[in-house]
């Protein structure tokens, strides 16, 4: 009755739980219920209430099941009691699964549970004790799963332990316990298929049912120190007892057993020896409560998966009592859903055999205290062990320890000990390495870690292997945990010394320095390596200075080079070439190479610069012998200079390596590091002999370096390379090795490995160790046999030591060439600044330099005149400044001359028409005032009265309104409005030869090269005057004439400061467009100039003068030409029909002087000039042997001798070389048309039609005869025969005249070269130059019937025949000249005059502003009807050659280019 009551009370809660939900389910359908029973042994410290609370709402959240947990504790776990409890529970409570755990170590429990599951089909989980033991053969129909490892899994861990400790030789002992065959088969298969060098010597299978004698016989076959045992716990007690009797459980034997042998860790048989190693399920980190929870979770997860898939769960088993026959297998069970289960983030899957896929196994060892100790863990197929060297336990008191197996500690430090990973394929150490254990921390806070198998090699490892073979010992090698050599801290030794002192290691082998402090606690062997303290520093690349390309030469050499180049050599070459008889400039001076290039200082510098640096630049080589010698010597200097520079350049362009020089530990950098900026940084590895030495000898140095100490050598090397450390102090042997093996050889030791505090490395042994003497003898033997030297050569010599003398070259990068690029950038910046300054100067500042901003001559003008005076030896007198006009002395002379012209009082020489005018005297007076007004306005006549531009009417009569005005295609600026001497054309007053007038242009002019242009202009004056005179005579000038000839040199014709013949000559002739008051705006359309009587903006004085001028038939003026902006279009000139020559015009004899008022020899004005450079050097007869014919007429009554004498008194000059030539009065009146013999040999760039203007002196003739005979010749030879009209071939197509038949209103058009050639054939130009017969029917021959010789003419590019030349003077032009003199003809023959008393030519100086049109709408002068000849100037007057162009007149002007540079 008591038994029944007991079971009733036991099953009642389950029945209540099972019966409780039924009415609710019937009333309301809910989630299916899942009943899980938990049965545990009574020895566990847990109650049923606690078991039921292990599964709460938190764990059941999200599950589609209503989980009910039934907990049951058992007092007895024998097989009968166990079956009874399980069957009674199934009968009382319908359960779907069972979680079972017991406290026994009997594998029979597992067999019983497997039997129950196979018959009831209830899933059972064995989580602890015998229920989790290995079960070899399970029923295939059972659903029995165990929280444990299979036989194969445990065998794998056992082999892994042996592999880590390099126990490759072992024996296998088993019994006939179920599963032994699987165990043996698996071990053999693993050994045979592994790369590890396993050696399984014996496989012994014992049958414990026989006598112990047979067992001993089998165990005696074991000769290995490692034995694998597979059997039950009871069988293990018997086998180990027999093994102890055979001495197989001593100090050097290792028994490794599975969890089947260890069983319950709380029950340890006494026969188990200390040091027994077992692989067991983790009971330390995997508690029973966690296992129960995971078991319930596995069942609920599997049921949920089945419900989700099949919509139902297996039916609960009501009872296990029934028929003996086997029930039917249900269609679906939980077995397949329990194989792959993941719950609570853990993989709890099972294999088909019912074991966990990832079991939690541990390695336990029976320590000397007879307790199981966890020493390792197997997790995720990885084994981690606690001990680096497996501890040797003294199993029993009767066992003697083996002294030949040593535990050795070492320290990783290349090249003495080098640690590497094991071979991943073989999982062992390769040849020449030994296994070693290295402790690796897992958790730094708790210092938890594991020992990992590594492989060690190096200098000390090779010595250890030699010692092991020589002294005969075995060893286990491990690395010191703290990575230190050994230091006493708080009276506790650490590092390798600590391991030896505290007997955890027998000896310490490595880079361990012998010192006094360590020798007190350990014994050292003899030194095997000499070492000490050394200092390592890093080579810094250094920086290449941007001026590295200049460093091959010192600064003084560069300065001397440029001084020699710019100051000495270049100037010497220039001077030698300038004064050389065959040089450029001397040839130009003598007329040998006109219009050719010149050799300047700039060209000399450019030539020498190109020679120095071998630049292939176009240079101009000198012609003079002296300068060539100088250049040749300079070329030799350049070769030496450049070769020396190139040879030394490479040494300065590379980056110099910088190394800190340290003499020793007592160096100032170590003792006083703060004296350097930045402070010198150095350190060492603490807890070593180096630090101890520094601490004891240099306390301040040790105190400073503590903040720079490094953790290890590798960290120190990185700090050196990265610049965090300047010097590293350490053992010399290690530093020498690191320096020799450093990548890039950037690390060096001072003094090539200089050592301070010399000592050595030794092996540390325990105090009083019996191994010391044997090890000392072995080390000495290695040294004597040379084996130690071989090891040093192998390990301690690096590649950098072998190649330290080799030159290591590298490419030059941008740092090496930075200086050159900086120089280029600076040159570009300087060029840009120069470019901006050049534009700023040209557009803004050059006016001030030319004198516009002040009332003084421009700076450039003064410098140019000064240079000229220095070179040519011309003295420039400094005169006092005018109180009214602040100019130079020569300009003051001009001012006085103008004032004298203003105050003319003598009117006796004026003709009757002028004398009758009441305004004549006031005209002269006010004209002078107008000039003074212009001077007060700084030379700008146009703005003297601040008048705006207005339209002008033509000053011509009605018969001139059809003439078109032309202007050269050129724009001049206001700088040419200056009234500077040498610039303006001067004319003579006809009434008084001593009166001079200047014509000032109203338009501004552009500055050009006055000296060069005048040099070439005057060159043409000296052409043929001397060569055509058959008789050379000396000028018998009076003393007065000689005095005048040496006066002011500023009136030389070369001083036409503002002439620009070269630029005007290359412009096409265009219509002159009228200007208005809108800022000189240029218009594109052509408008015919509107002629008016007088300019509207002229003052009253100007109008009076113009009216007077119009009635004066003999007034002539030379004007300074100015230009306005041209309209760049061509319009053939329009001609007036039926222009006839006035019949009442008499042509006076220009040189007739019946009244003999003046000397007959003084037919020209004497010029104040310097004698030419070759004039003084000629002999009396040779000086004038180049006289030529001249424009002059002899008086009717005068003999030929008088005429010749008069001619001899006048001279001209060569147009090219300025040599003096007589018989020409217009020395400074116009550009000379003559050349000397020397200049005739040189070809001009443009051939000039320079047919002789003067004729051979013939019989005396009257003016009428001269006119009739000279008329046709003058018409045929164009105005250039009178005024040196020089035309360009490439511009003549711009002036094609329109035929007479064309309509005047027809619009203008441009004509190209091709069209010109077509128009010339059969048009107006074919008969353009025909001479009227009426003009050629005169009976009197010309005074000069013979023209220039062919040899004296320039070879022209224009047609040779006058009929082919469209630029020659036409008859129509002469008709126009009869009516009014064209202002474009500044140099003309004077016509014969009826006035007998007016025998000499007299020119009036008048202001151009008083009659010139400021907007160029009409002609500016009223000219008389005359056939012009060149004026014969009186010597008493001074005037300069007139300007080529007059801006107030529209005319055609063609002038010769003076130089090739201006044309190109």
Swiss-Prot record:
The disulfides recorded in the entry are 87-320, 429-455, 436-456, 745-800
Q: Where is this region: Pore-forming?
A: 599-620
* Effect annotated for changing residue 436 to R: In FESD; severely decreased function in ion transmembrane transport when expressed in Xenopus oocytes; severely reduced localization to the cell membrane; changed glutamate-gated calcium ion channel activity characterized by increased glutamate potency and decreased glycine potency
User: Mutating residue 989 to S: effect?
Assistant: Found in a patient with neonatal onset epileptic encephalopathy; uncertain significance
Q: Name one Pfam family in it.
A: Lig_chan-Glu_bd
Q: Phosphoserine occurs at which residues?
A: 882, 890, 929, 1025, 1059, 1062, 1198, 1291
Phenotype when changing residue 498 to S: In FESD; uncertain significance
Substitution effect: residue 716 to D = In FESD; uncertain significance
Listed result of changing residue 653 to V: In FESD; likely pathogenic; decreased localization to the cell membrane; results in increased agonist potency and channel activation at lower glutamate and glycine concentrations compared to wild type channels
| Effect ascribed to mutating residue 884 to N | Found in a patient with autism; uncertain significance
Outcome of substituting residue 731 to N: In FESD; likely pathogenic; decreased protein abundance; decreased localization to the cell membrane; decreased glutamate-gated calcium ion channel activity characterized by drastically decreased glutamate agonist potency, decreased glycine agonist potency, reduced amplitude of current response, shortened synaptic-like response time course, decreased channel open probability and enhanced sensitivity to negative allosteric modulators
The record gives the effect of mutating residue 518 to H as: In FESD; decreased protein abundance; decreased localization to the cell membrane; affects glutamate-gated calcium ion channel activity and alters the duration of channel open and closed states
Q: What is the effect of changing residue 1153 to N?
A: Found in a cutaneous malignant melanoma sample; somatic mutation
What's in the GO CC field?
A: cell surface; cytoplasmic vesicle membrane; dendritic spine; endoplasmic reticulum membrane; glutamatergic synapse; NMDA selective glutamate receptor complex; plasma membrane; postsynaptic density
Function recorded in the entry = Component of N-methyl-D-aspartate (NMDA) receptors (NMDARs) that function as heterotetrameric, ligand-gated cation channels with high calcium permeability and voltage-dependent block by Mg(2+). NMDARs participate in synaptic plasticity for learning and memory formation by contributing to the slow phase of excitatory postsynaptic current, long-term synaptic potentiation, and learning.
Q: What is the name of this protein?
A: Glutamate receptor ionotropic, NMDA 2A
């Amino acid at each position: 009755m008591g038994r029944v009551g007991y079971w009733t009370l036991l099953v009642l809660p389950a029945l209540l739980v099972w019966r409780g939900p039924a009415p609710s389910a019937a009333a309301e359908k809910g989630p299916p219920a899942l009943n899980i029973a938990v049965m545990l042994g009574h020895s566990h410290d847990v109650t049923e209430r606690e078991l039921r609370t292990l599964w709460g709402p938190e764990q059941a959240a999200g599950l589609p099941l209503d989980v009910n947990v039934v907990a049951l504790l058992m007092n007895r776990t024998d097989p009968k009691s166990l079956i009874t409890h399980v069957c009674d529970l199934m009968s009382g409570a319908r359960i779907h699964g069972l979680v079972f755990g017991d406290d026994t170590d009997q594998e029979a429990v597992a067999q019983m549970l497997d039997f129950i599951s196979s018959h009831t089909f209830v899933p059972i989980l064995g989580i602890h004790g015998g229920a989790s033991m290995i079960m070899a053969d399970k029923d295939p129909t059972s659903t029995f799963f165990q929280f444990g490892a299979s036989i194969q899994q445990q065998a794998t861990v056992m082999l892994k332990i042996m592999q880590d400790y390099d126990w490759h030789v072992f024996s296998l002992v088993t019994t006939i316990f179920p599963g032994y065959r699987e165990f043996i088969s698996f071990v053999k298969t693993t050994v045979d298929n592994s790369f590890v060098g396993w050696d399984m010597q014996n496989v012994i299978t014992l049958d414990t049912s026989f006598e112990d004698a047979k067992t001993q016989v089998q165990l005696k076959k074991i000769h290995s120190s490692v034995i694998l045992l597979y059997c039950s716990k009871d069988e293990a007690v018997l086998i180990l007892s027999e093994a102890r009797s055979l001495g197989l459980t001593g100090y050097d034997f290792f028994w490794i057993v599975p969890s089947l042998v260890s069983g319950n860790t709380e029950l340890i048989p006494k026969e188990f020896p200390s040091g027994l190693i077992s692989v067991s399920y983790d009971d330390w980190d995997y508690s029973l409560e966690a296992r129960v929870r995971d078991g319930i979770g596995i069942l609920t997860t599997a049921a949920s998966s089945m419900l989700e898939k099949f919509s139902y769960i297996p039916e609960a088993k009501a009872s296990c009592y029934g028929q003996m026959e086997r029930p039917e297998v249900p269609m679906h069970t939980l077995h397949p859903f329990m194989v792959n289960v993941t719950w609570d983030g853990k993989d709890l899957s099972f294999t088909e055999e019912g074991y966990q896929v990832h079991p939690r196994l541990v390695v336990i060892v029976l320590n000397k205290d007879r307790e199981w100790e966890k020493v390792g863990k197997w997790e995720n197929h990885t084994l981690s062990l606690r001990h680096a060297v497996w501890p040797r336990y003294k199993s029993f008191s009767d066992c003697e320890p083996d002294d030949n197996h040593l535990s050795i500690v070492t320290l990783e430090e290349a090249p003495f000990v080098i640690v590497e990973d094991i071979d991943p394929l073989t999982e062992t150490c390769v040849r020449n390495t030994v296994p070693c254990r290295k402790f690796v921390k897992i958790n730094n806070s708790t210092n938890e870690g594991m020992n990992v198998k590594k492989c060690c090699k190096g200098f000390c490892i090779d010595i250890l292997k030699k010692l092991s073979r020589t002294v005969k010992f075995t060893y286990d090698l491990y690395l010191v945990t703290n990575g230190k050599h050994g230091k006493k801290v708080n009276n506790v030794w650490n590092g390798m010394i600590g391991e030896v002192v505290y007997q955890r290691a027998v000896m310490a082998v490595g880079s361990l320095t012998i010192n006094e402090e360590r020798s007190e606690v350990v014994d050292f062997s003899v030194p095997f390596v000499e070492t000490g303290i050394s200092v390592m520093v890093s080579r810094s690349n250094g920086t290449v200075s941007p001026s590295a390309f200049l460093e091959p030469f010192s600064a003084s050499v560069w300065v001397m080079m440029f001084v020699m180049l710019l100051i000495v050599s270049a100037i010497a070459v220039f001077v030698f070439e300038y004064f050389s008889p065959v040089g450029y400039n001397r040839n130009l001076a003598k007329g040998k190479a006109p219009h050719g290039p010149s050799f300047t200082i700039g060209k000399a510098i450019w030539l020498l610069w190109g020679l120095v640096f071998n630049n292939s630049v176009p240079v101009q080589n000198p012609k003079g012998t002296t300068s060539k010698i100088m250049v040749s010597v300079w070329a030799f200097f350049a070769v030496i200079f450049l070769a020396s520079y190139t040879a030394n350049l490479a040494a300065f362009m590379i980056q110099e390596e910088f190394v800190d020089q340290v003499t020793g530990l007592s160096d100032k950098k170590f003792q006083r590091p703060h004296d350097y900026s930045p402070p010198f940084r150095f350190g060492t590895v603490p807890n070593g002999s180096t630090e101890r030495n520094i601490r004891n000898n240099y306390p301040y140095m040790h105190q400073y370096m503590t903040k720079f100490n490094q953790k290890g050598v590798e960290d120190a090397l990185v700090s050196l390379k990265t610049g965090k450390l300047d010097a590293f102090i350490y053992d010399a042997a290690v530093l020498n090795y690191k320096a020799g093996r450093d990548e890039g050889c950037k690390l060096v030791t001072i003094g090539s490995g200089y050592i301070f505090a010399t000592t050595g490395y030794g092996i540390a042994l325990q105090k009083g160790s019996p191994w010391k003497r044997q090890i000392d003898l072995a080390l000495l033997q290695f040294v004597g046999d040379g084996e130690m030297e071989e090891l040093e050569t192998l390990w301690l010599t690096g590649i950098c030591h072998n190649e330290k003398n080799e030159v290591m070259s590298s490419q030059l990068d941008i740092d090496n060439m930075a200086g050159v690029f900086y120089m280029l950038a600076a040159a570009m910046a300087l060029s840009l600044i120069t470019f901006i300054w050049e534009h700023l100067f040209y557009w803004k500042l050059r006016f001030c330099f030319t004198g516009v901003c002040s009332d003084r001559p421009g700076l450039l003008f003064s410098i140019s005149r000064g240079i000229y005076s220095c070179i040519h030896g011309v003295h420039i007198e400094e005169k006092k400044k005018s109180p009214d006009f602040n100019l130079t002395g020569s300009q003051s002379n001009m001012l006085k001359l103008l004032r004298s012209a203003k105050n003319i009082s003598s009117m006796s020489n004026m003709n009757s028409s002028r004398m009758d005018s009441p305004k004549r005297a006031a005209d002269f007076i006010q004209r002078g005032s107008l000039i003074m007004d212009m001077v007060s306005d700084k030379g700008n006549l146009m703005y003297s009265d601040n008048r705006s531009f207005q339209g002008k009417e033509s000053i011509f009569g009605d018969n001139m309104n059809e003439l078109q005005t032309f202007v050269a295609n050129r724009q001049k600026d206001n700088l040419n409005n200056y009234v500077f001497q040498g610039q303006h054309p001067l004319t003579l007053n006809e009434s008084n030869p001593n009166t001079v007038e200047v014509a000032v242009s109203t338009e501004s002019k552009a500055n050009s090269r006055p000296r060069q242009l005048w040099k070439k202009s005057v060159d043409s004056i000296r052409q043929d005057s001397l060569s055509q005179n058959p008789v050379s005579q000396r000028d018998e000038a009076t003393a007065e004439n000689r005095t005048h000839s040496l006066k002011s040199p500023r009136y030389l014709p070369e001083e036409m400061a503002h002439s620009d013949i070269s630029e005007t000559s290359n412009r096409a002739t265009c219509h002159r467009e009228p200007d208005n008051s809108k800022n000189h705006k240029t218009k594109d359309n052509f408008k015919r100039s509107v002629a008016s009587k007088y300019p509207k903006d002229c003052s009253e004085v100007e109008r009076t003068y113009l009216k007077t001028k119009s009635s004066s038939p003999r007034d002539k003026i030379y004007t300074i030409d100015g230009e306005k902006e041209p309209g760049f279009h061509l319009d053939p000139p329009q001609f007036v029909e039926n222009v006839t020559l006035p019949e009442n015009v008499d042509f006076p004899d220009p040189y007739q002087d019946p009244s003999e008022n003046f000397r007959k020899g003084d037919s020209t004005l004497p010029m104040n000039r310097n004698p030419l450079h070759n004039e003084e050097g000629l002999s009396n007869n040779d000086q004038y042997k180049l006289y030529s014919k001249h424009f002059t007429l002899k008086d009717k009554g005068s003999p030929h001798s008088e005429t010749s004498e008069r001619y001899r008194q006048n001279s001209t000059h060569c147009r090219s070389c300025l040599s003096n030539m007589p018989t020409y009065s217009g020395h400074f009146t116009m550009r000379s048309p003559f050349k000397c013999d020397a200049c005739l040999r040189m070809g001009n760039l443009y051939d000039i039609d320079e047919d002789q203007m003067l004729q051979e002196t013939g019989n005396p003739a009257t003016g009428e005869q001269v006119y009739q005979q000279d008329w046709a010749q003058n018409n045929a030879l164009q105005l250039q025969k009178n005024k040196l009209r020089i035309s360009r071939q490439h511009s003549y197509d711009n002036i094609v005249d329109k035929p007479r038949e064309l309509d005047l209103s027809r619009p203008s058009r441009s004509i190209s070269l091709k069209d010109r050639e077509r128009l010339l054939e059969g048009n107006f130009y074919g008969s353009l130059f025909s001479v009227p017969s009426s003009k050629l029917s005169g009976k009197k021959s010309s005074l000069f019937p013979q023209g220039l010789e062919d040899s004296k003419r320039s070879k022209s590019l224009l047609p040779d025949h006058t009929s082919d030349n469209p630029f020659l003077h036409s008859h129509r032009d002469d008709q126009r000249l009869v009516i009014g003199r064209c202002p474009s003809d500044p140099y003309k023959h004077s016509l014969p005059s009826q006035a007998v008393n007016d025998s000499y030519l007299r020119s009036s100086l008048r202001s151009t502003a008083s009659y010139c049109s400021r907007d160029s709408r009409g002609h500016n002068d009223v000219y008389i009807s005359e056939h012009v000849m060149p004026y014969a100037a009186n010597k008493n007057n001074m005037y300069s050659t007139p300007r080529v162009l007059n801006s107030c007149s529209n005319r055609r002007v063609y002038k010769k280019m003076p130089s090739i540079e201006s044309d190109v």
